[in-house]
Amino acid sequence: MKKILSVCVCALLAFTLSAQENPEKKPKKKTAQVPANRANDHFVVQLGYTNWSGIPDSITKSGLSKSINAYFMLDYPFKTNPKLSIGIGLGIGSDHITFTKTYVGIKDLTPTFQFTNQSDTNHFKKTKLATSYLEAPIELRFTSDPSTGKGFKAALGVKVGTLINAHTRNTKFQNKAGTSINEFVMKESSKRFFNKTRISATARFGIGHISLYGAYQFTALLKDGSGPEVRPYSIGISLSGL
C-alpha cells in the first residue's frame, strides 16, 4: 500500500513539474488588417449654401450666399477596425454673403460694423462680403467599405481657422428708382471688425465620393461690441477622393 501511495505521489509531482515547464500558451489577439489600397479621401472640396444665425431684421440679404472650402487631409485608420479612422488636414475655407441695396461699412472708422439700408437713395445693387480662413479640420471617420471607398461614409469633427482676408465687392451703382448710374466695381478690405479665430462643428454623410456636409460656427463672426452677434452656418455638397 505504501509503495502504491509513493508511486502516485511521484507521478503527481512529475505531472506538476511538467505543467510548470510547459505553460499553456494563450493565442495572440488578432488585429484587423488595414487594406493596402484603402481609400483615404486625401482631398476634400465643398460647395454649399451659407447663412448667418442671429441676423437682425434690419440687415437685408439677397441672392444665393455660398461657402467654398478645399482641404488636404491625412487619414489614420484604427488598427483594431479599419472602417474607423481619424482625418487631419489643412486648407482654405471661405464664406460669401450677398446683400441688396445695403451699404456694408467694412472700412468705416465707426466703433461698430454698419449695415445700412440705402434703398431710398443711390446705392449698389449688390454687395458681397467675403471672409477667408486658413483652417485645420479634424474628423472621426467611418466607411463601410474601406477597400474601395464606394460604400456609406460618415464623418464628425471640428475645424479651427484663422482669418486671412475679409473684403466687400460692390457692383451696379443705381439710383433709388433702380436706374443704372455706373457699372463700376468697388472693392474694400479690412479685418478690423472680425474675430481672428473661428471654431466650427462639421459633419459629412454620403455614398462613395459624394456627401452632404454641414458646418456651424461656434464663435461669433464679429468681435464683441462690433456688431450683431451672428454665427455662420452652411450646408452643401462635399466631394472627396484619393
Task: Describe each model-derived feature in a short phrase.
Residues P56-G63, T98-T131, L163-N175, I181-S200:
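Extracellular/periplasm-exposed beta-strand and loop segments of Gram-negative cell-envelope proteins
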Residues V185-L242:
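Predominantly the C-terminal beta-signal and adjacent terminal strand-loop region
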Residues E24-Q33, N51-S53, M73-K79, R141-P146, ...:
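Outer-membrane beta-barrel proteins
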Residues T50-Y71, L222-D224:
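Surface-exposed strand-loop-strand hairpins of Gram-negative outer-membrane beta-barrel proteins
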Residues K28-D41, P77-L84, D145-F152, H167:
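Short loop/turn motifs that connect adjacent beta-strands in outer-membrane beta-barrel proteins
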Residues A39-D41, S62-A70, A130-A136, K150, ...:
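Residues that define the transmembrane beta-barrel architecture of outer-membrane proteins
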Residues V45, A70-Y76, L90-I92, A136-F142, ...:
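Residues on the lipid-exposed face of transmembrane beta-strands in outer-membrane beta-barrel proteins
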